[in-house]
């Protein structure tokens, strides 16, 4: 995919249509399946996995998310999240970011936090319904900021907190009642609070 302009984000259970399908496949470790040459994670077949979710809709193709723990034994090309970023261009990063987050919500969030009851399958509005309490749960949204501090032709990078070999732009979560501007000031001040990274 060279351009995501022809695709719009959506969500719904995958149903076979006359449209072509591009499949993304995660295993139970949240690793994504690349092709043999490590050039793409979008496959033009679904590997006979039954349940999937349409996450992008295009004019002639849809992009569908699949997760299957059995497929890991059949393929050697599953790649961990940290290793994928050097393999992705901007357009594929958009697809990967959405797919990875949805994969975590759909396949890793299985039980109601109130009762421990197993959820029903995810619905078309991304909700998961608990039969015990009748409450619909939705993915958590965590507003955050990413700040780039520039001076002439230089950019300020900070050492990644959990992976000292990585450097990154300044990033962190926005606290309740805090504006984006206030969060930027706090993370870029001489004694900033701990960055989320």
Please provide the spans of the model-predicted regions:
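Conserved small/polar residues in nucleotide/adenosyl-binding loops
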Residues: 187-197
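N-terminal alpha-helical interaction blocks
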Residues: 1-89
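N-terminal strand-loop-strand
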Residues: 26, 127-169, 173
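Hydrophobic alpha-helical positions that pack around
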Residues: 170, 184-189
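Cys/His-rich short segments
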Residues: 101-146
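A gly/proline- and charged-residue-enriched helix-loop-helix capping module
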Residues: 79-102, 109
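Phosphate-binding active sites in nucleotide-utilizing proteins
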Residues: 180
